[in-house]
Amino acid sequence: MEFLHESVALGVDLLILGLCAREYVHYKRTAKVLKAAPQYNIDGDLKSVVERQRDKKIPYAVIRGTVTPIGVPLRSSLVPSVSGVLQIVKLHEHRVTRGFAGFWTEQHKLLHESANEMPFELRNQSHGVEIVDALSAAVLDVDVVYDNYEPSNLSLFDHVFGFFSGVRQRGLQTTEEVLREGSFLTAIGELELDGDTLRMQPSNEGPLFLTTATKSTLIKRFEDAKTTTILKLVVCSTISAILVAFIAKKLYRKRKQEREEAKIRERLDTERRERRARSRPHTLSQDQLCVVCSTNPKEIILLPCGHVCLCEDCAQKISVTCPVCRGSIVSKAAAFIA
């Protein structure tokens, strides 16, 4: 308990340090695979390029093209004039909650999310690459086509109940995001030739990206994020080093104090034994000597057996059973032998 606050602070800092290190590794690896990923044009030569690869796959590649639905495009449920290939509708609750300190803070809570997706491809004139599992993309650039906030009409009872419960609803927000038909995107993932169809899908080499940014812009984003994470690592490492040094200093002082106290106790015990030796009679019979060390006189009575058989030094070391009768020792007391 002596180092509780320092230990908790160090544990939290190490946890944050671990999360930052994990982020750094992720950003570094993603930037590395992005730099190594080849970029191809969607044209008539792309199929032959993929076909020459092992298993007819390019593990991580970059393509750019126009979003084109395979079939009838989806219509926005909230804005019918908008069509696309992917639709995400979210319902958020806006509320204020009372924290431990008594302050009210605003929070957003996702109540419902639904997504619709249809087959689509990235095309360049008459050539295209089908996109598989677009919703799993690490970066998915979509357009917000609908955003509506409806404040709550709270009654007096709702206000009173919210005050005592610590949660008060402020309103509901509905948003709809659509990947529009005709959008120009950069897709990064595994490029595979399945029969006569080219497909872009999630890869084991790196995350799937469907973004309006270029490859170089994505790399710059991850490099900037990596630099920021390095600064976080430096700060967290410095704090950890300071906390470890502070705890080590306190431990050193504690151990030093304990050693000094032990030396004082040992010196006092030695002086006490010397005083006892000077004050006791020089000639003692065998019956008057401690049954353990046979040097000091009997000074302690063991209870409940009542045997007077130990000196004070040996009594400090024996606390379980009586050395004479092997009975359990409940307590000890000084014995005065005339």
From Swiss-Prot:
User: Which superkingdom heads the taxonomic lineage of this protein's source?
Assistant: Eukaryota
Q: Where in the cell is it found?
A: Mitochondrion outer membrane
* Catalytic activity entry: S-ubiquitinyl-[E2 ubiquitin-conjugating enzyme]-L-cysteine + [acceptor protein]-L-lysine = [E2 ubiquitin-conjugating enzyme]-L-cysteine + N(6)-ubiquitinyl-[acceptor protein]-L-lysine
Q: Spell out where the chain crosses the membrane.
A: 4-24, 228-248
* GO annotation, cellular component aspect: mitochondrial outer membrane; peroxisome
Q: How does it sit in the membrane?
A: Multi-pass membrane protein
For the biological process aspect of GO, one term held by this record is: protein ubiquitination
Which UniProt key words apply to this protein? Isopeptide bond, Membrane, Metal-binding, Mitochondrion, Mitochondrion outer membrane, Transferase, Transmembrane, Transmembrane helix, Ubl conjugation, Ubl conjugation pathway, Zinc, Zinc-finger
According to its UniProt record, how is this protein modified after translation? Auto-ubiquitinated.
Subunit and interaction comment? Interacts with Marf.
The protein depicted here goes by the name Mitochondrial E3 ubiquitin protein ligase 1
Protein source organism: Drosophila melanogaster
